[in-house]
Structures are given as structure tokens and as C-alpha cells.
């Protein structure tokens, strides 16, 4: 006989990452009976999470393992100082802080699918389990177990391979964080897709170094990026002395704003990945209180909690902003390898408040569109042409973006 949980929770959150844990904590803090379902017990999140310090909610800034003020980008031979603090999150501290906000039940198991069951939901597990709940939330990450999102033209991926290692010679300037280094010291880096170095000095002789493909379709593989990283480090005379750990990431960047309805999703499962940077944790931590309040209010009033959650997570303003972001994705995908450094050279040459707002997780469509127009106006002709092609390929969306830039509503 299949295991069955007769006790119905108010909310069952699928996923054990930062997004699911943050939402579970905020829901429980509002007096709801919450179950969080993950294939493992509570444990520090395994990925490396960085964020602009100012994008994190105030409480989360105390969970920073390290903060750099020397943050730079190389889109040519000389560095551009970005002048904005950047944080590496301490995942154990983040989990500890979230778990300390409220009490909720952590359930070990793997969800397969969810179905409507009367006024609530039944979630079916891989081991034959069944969990009943008034509301189910899919926060399972980029895999989106029960609420898949759509990617226009197919998923365009960000892929990256990195290591934490010890170096006899520093691979980047000690004390610095390199957000993007498009220089090509090795022949390997002059072929194929453009990739860049993302690096953090962790103290002493320890560094995190990662070769990243910002967005591509198809994207470079783990093996390709590993070769590129090692070629880069070898060419600049800084091979790793002792590798402590490896990291590989691959996730889609071009999610459409999901249609409301069905299973409520959260975080990356809801498409809340920034389509230009790939960041999502700062946004998920910031969104959790508002989404939790909307859900709790709807459940208390006997209203559709999933609809309330979707409305809080994907407002009309956010949907308009995502459409503008996807125009930017089309532009990036249309740029040749040699054009990307020029594009970002222009981007980071804008006043800091302009490019920083573009990279912020919650910027309005008009501000985004005006920044894109400034980049178009200031960049060189060989970059401007593919940007124009990308805009002309989506005339309706481009028209709405221009209207937003002008402050018009259409």
C-alpha cells in the first residue's frame, strides 16, 4: 500500500534551495502550517552564490562570507572599476538565518507531480508517497518539476565551469573580485563562443575562478569550459597548484513570464532568473515576504492562493519588464564573439546608476528600455547593426519598449 499523509498542510513547498527555503520561512512566519519537500535533509546550499550587496535584502547582507569593494570588469586591456560592492554568500549562515525565522516541517522525498484534489492539492512522490496540501508551490529550481516555463526559440543557456583552488601566483589582482574578464590570453579563447573569467580572491592563496558563457544556444559544454579555463590560467602563468572543489552550472536565461494558473512556482522554477546576468537568489530572498503575505491573505479569506501568489510574483509591471529583457537576450544572442566585449564596454561605460539598475532584479520596463537605447546610441556600428536586427525581429515588443522608454502606456 502506498504511504499516505492524511494531515493536510496549508502549503507544501517543493525544493530545498534558497528560494524554497526563503518562501517556506516567510510563509511559516505568517502562521501557516508549511511543509518543505526536498530529496535531502536541511544542508548548506551547494552552489556558489554571489550578488551585488545592494540587491540583497538588509538582513541577508549579514550572511555575506566576503564583500569586495575592488570589483572590476575587463572588456579590453585595462580594467573598468565597477564601484559597487559585491558579496559572496555564506550558504550555511543563510540557511541558519532562514531556519531561525520560524518553525516549519522539512520532509525528505522527491516529488513527481501534483494534482488537484477537491479544494486542495495532492503531491505524489517517487517512493509512492502522497502529501495533501491546500496549496503547492514548485520551487525546485531550473528543472521546474511540476510547473515548466517556456523559452522563446528554445532554451538559451548560461554555462560555467569553475574551481576553488590554491595558486602559487595570483590569477587575478589580490583583494579583487573580477565580475567579467573577456581578455583572450590563450588561442583557445579566440575560437568558438565568447567566454569570460569570473573570479574572486577568497583570501591567502585561495581563489574561485570560473570560465563562463553568458548566454548561448547551443552553449559550451563542461569539457569545453574546463579546457578554456585551464588554457587561460596556463597562458597567464597562473595554473592552479591544488584544486579544492569544482563547480558546473547550466541553466536557461530566456524564460518568458509564465501564464498565471495551475501550480504556483517560485524562484527559478517561476522564470525569475535575470535574463542578462543569470542572477536570481537576491530577487528570491527579496520577493519572499510579499509573495508569502499574498498567499497567507488569500488562504485566510478563502480565495485562490495560487492566483494571489502569481499576481504578487509576476505583476503587470514585471511582465512588461521581462518582455524588454528578452529583447536584450535577442540582442546578445545576435552578437558575434568579438562584439560582446565591445557591447559590455559600452554598457559599463554608462553612469553606474544606469547599468546597476539594469542588472537589478526588479527594474521597470521604461528604465530598462532607456538604458538599452543609451547603449545602442553610444556603441560602435559593428555592434549597433545586430542590436537593430534583434529589435526589428520583434516589432511589437520593440514598439512597447519604445513607448515604455517614453513613459507612454499602450
Curated annotation (Swiss-Prot):
List the Pfam families. Answer: Lycopene_cycl
**Protein name according to UniProt:** Uncharacterized carotenoid cyclase DR_0801
Q: Which residues bind NAD(+)?
A: 11-39
**What organism is the protein native to?**
Deinococcus radiodurans (strain ATCC 13939 / DSM 20539 / JCM 16871 / CCUG 27074 / LMG 4051 / NBRC 15346 / NCIMB 9279 / VKM B-1422 / R1)
Spell out the family assignment given in the record's similarity comment: Belongs to the lycopene cyclase family.
Question: By its UniProt entry, which NCBIfam families does this protein fall under?
Answer: carotene-cycl
Give GO terms: molecular function aspect only.
intramolecular oxidoreductase activity; oxidoreductase activity, acting on paired donors, with incorporation or reduction of molecular oxygen
Question: Could you tell me which InterPro entries the record lists for this protein?
Answer: FAD/NAD-bd_sf, Lycopene_cyclase_b/e
List UniProt keywords, sorted A-Z. Carotenoid biosynthesis, NAD, Oxidoreductase
Task: Please spell out the taxonomic lineage of the organism that makes this protein.
Answer: Bacteria, Thermotogati, Deinococcota, Deinococci, Deinococcales
Amino acid at each position: 500500500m502506498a504511504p499516505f499523509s492524511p494531515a493536510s498542510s496549508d502549503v507544501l513547498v517543493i525544493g530545498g534551495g534558497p528560494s524554497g527555503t526563503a518562501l517556506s520561512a516567510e510563509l511559516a512566519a505568517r502562521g501557516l502550517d508549511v511543509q518543505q519537500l526536498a530529496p535531502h535533509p536541511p544542508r548548506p546550499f551547494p552552489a556558489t552564490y554571489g550578488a551585488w550587496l545592494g540587491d540583497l535584502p538588509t538582513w541577508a547582507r549579514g550572511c555575506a562570507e566576503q564583500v569586495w569593494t575592488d570589483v572590476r570588469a575587463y572588456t579590453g586591456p585595462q580594467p573598468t572599476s565597477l564601484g559597487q560592492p559585491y558579496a559572496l554568500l555564506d550558504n550555511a549562515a543563510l540557511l541558519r538565518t532562514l531556519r531561525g525565522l520560524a518553525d516549519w516541517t522539512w520532509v525528505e522525498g522527491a516529488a513527481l507531480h501534483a494534482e488537484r484534489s477537491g479544494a486542495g492539492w495532492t503531491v505524489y512522490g517517487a517512493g509512492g508517497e502522497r502529501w495533501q496540501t491546500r496549496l503547492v508551490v514548485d520551487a525546485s529550481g531550473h528543472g521546474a518539476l511540476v510547473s515548466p516555463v517556456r523559452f522563446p526559440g528554445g532554451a538559451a543557456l548560461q554555462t560555467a565551469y569553475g574551481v576553488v583552488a590554491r595558486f602559487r601566483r595570483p590569477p587575478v589582482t589580490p583583494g579583487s573580485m573580477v565580475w567579467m574578464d573577456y581578455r583572450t590570453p590563450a588561442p583557445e579563447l579566440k575560437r568558438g563562443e565568447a567566454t569570460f573569467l569570473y573570479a574572486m580572491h577568497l583570501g591567502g592563496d585561495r581563489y574561485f575562478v570560473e570560465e563562463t558563457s553568458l548566454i548561448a544556444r547551443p552553449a559550451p559544454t563542461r569539457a569545453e569550459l574546463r579546457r578554456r579555463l585551464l588554457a587561460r590560467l596556463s597562458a597567464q602563468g597562473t595554473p592552479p597548484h591544488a584544486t579544492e572543489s569544482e563547480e558546473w552550472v547550466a541553466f536557461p536565461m530566456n524564460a518568458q513570464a509564465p501564464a498565471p494558473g495551475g501550480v504556483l512556482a517560485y524562484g527559478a522554477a517561476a522564470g525569475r532568473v535575470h535574463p542578462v546576468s543569470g542572477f536570481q537568489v537576491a530577487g528570491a530572498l527579496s520577493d519572499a515576504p510579499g509573495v508569502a503575505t499574498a498567499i497567507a491573505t488569500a488562504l485566510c479569506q478563502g480565495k485562490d492562493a495560487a492566483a494571489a501568489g502569481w499576481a504578487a510574483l509576476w505583476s503587470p509591471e514585471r511582465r512588461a519588464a521581462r518582455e524588454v529583457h528578452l529583447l536584450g537576450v535577442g540582442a546578445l544572442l545576435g552578437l558575434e564573439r568579438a562584439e560582446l566585449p565591445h557591447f559590455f564596454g559600452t554598457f559599463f561605460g554608462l553612469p553606474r546608476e544606469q547599468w546597476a539598475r539594469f542588472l537589478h532584479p526588479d527594474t521597470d520596463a521604461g528604465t530598462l528600455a532607456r538604458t538599452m537605447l543609451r547603449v545602442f546610441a553610444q556603441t560602435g556600428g559593428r555592434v549597433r547593426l545586430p542590436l537593430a536586427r534583434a529589435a526589428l525581429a520583434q516589432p511589437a515588443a520593440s514598439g512597447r519598449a519604445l513607448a515604455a522608454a517614453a513613459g507612454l502606456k499602450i
